[in-house]
Amino acid sequence: MNKILTPQNRQIFFFIVLAYAFSVLCRLDWVWWASGFDEFIYNGKIIINTNDGYAFGEGARDMLAGFHQEGDLSYYGAPLSTLAYLIVKFTPFSLEGVMLYLSAVLSSLIVIPLILIAKTLGAPRAGLCAALLASIAHSYYNRTMVGYFDTDMLNIVLACFIIWGLVRLNAYKDTISALIASLSMLIYFWWYSSSFTLNVALIAMFLLYTLIWHKKEKIYYLTMILMLLAITSIAIWFKILLFALILFLYKSKFYQLSNKQNAIIIALGALIFAIFALSGGLNPIWFQLKFYLLRSTPEKDTLNFIFFNVNQTISESSIIPFGLFSERISSALGVFVLSFVGYVLAIFRHKILLLSLPMCALGFLALFSGLRFTIYAVPFMAFGFGFLLEILGSALNERIKQKSLFLFHLCRFCIYKANLV
């Protein structure tokens, strides 16, 4: 108990509560604004402001009713609809209330992994600064505000929890960290199936990092095996069963006392990769590359009719100027520049932050593939800003200490001379 209630842990808890409350309160501003317009009121309640939100809400409504009509395209059983259904079923909250406020409650959880990453790296104040900035950066705020009932409310949160698990693994080399990273990826893939490409990029980056700096650490390879299993297209109950079996084997005396640990890890990795490949694991990667990177031109059929690619007709997929790009990520061009400098310095100081590159790269893809991607760069660019402030603050404190020490010795010298006189 005393270990849990250390001064540092109390400080981290205070930082998390402060940043979370700040994030939620900032999002409530939309409620006060919308309540002043009759167009946003229906049956005495504020309505949500996204089209997709009503589709997810319909799915939750049908789940509460226990049925839906065949062919009605209901989001019955969708992860967000399922979560809303469970909250309404087992709490006193109404479906309308859940649809309105859930985004503010869940998206504000972004502050937790950012602060915990900073704590693990020994810079908790940088984490607090990053949490405060990331929670209200234009891109993240706009896509997670009250009334924005969409999967975006957890997309970035879960990705950051994955990276926190890997940062923690790098510090402690324990199975708890491996579980944090792999279970976060499991939930992320269930929550948002389009996260597959980012998850693959995170695994690939972690593999590269491991081969360069930690190629003899077996716990790293175990974590990669579990992460790959998490994004395999098989039943979730079967994944959880395999998770348990793999961890049981890793902790067993059979493995711990074996002189063929490397062979066992390789065999496990080959087995999981085979399941991954046979379940169609490479197909989504190719689809995403075609859709976002190979931004071709209109598709043509044999009769020469021209059809625009979908990503050419969606405003979120439109190419944006650099000024708007920087404002979407860091709210201002100057802050963006400082954030970028701080992010580079943070990577030089802590190589493990290289694992955040896939998220930032996806965010920077917005320059070519549309503003919808800027949200991915928000948390770690904000971390870069916080880290830069941490460095500047430490340098300033050191100068103040040096000046204070100089003044102290100067005073001693003056007093000494005065006594001589």
Where are these regions (language model features)?
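Perimembrane helix-loop-helix junctions
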Residues: L198-I265, L389-E398
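Signature aromatic-anchored transmembrane alpha helix within multi-pass, membrane-resident enzymes
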Residues: I266-A270, F383, I391-L420
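Alpha-helical transmembrane segments at the extracellular/periplasmic loop-to-helix junctions
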Residues: W237-A244, F273-S356
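Membrane-interfacial loop-to-transmembrane alpha-helix junctions, especially the N-terminal start
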Residues: I12, A126-C129, R168, D174-I180, ...
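Membrane-embedded helix bundles of polyisoprenyl
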Residues: S23, L102-I117, A126-N170, D174-T210, ...
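Active-site lumenal/periplasmic loops and adjacent helix-entry segments of GT-C-fold
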Residues: L28-L121, R125-C160, Y188
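Hydrophobic/aromatic-rich transmembrane helices and adjacent perimembrane loops
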Residues: L354-L357, L362-S404
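Start-transfer (signal-anchor) and selected internal transmembrane alpha helices
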Residues: M1-Y42, T120, G127-L128, L245-F273, ...
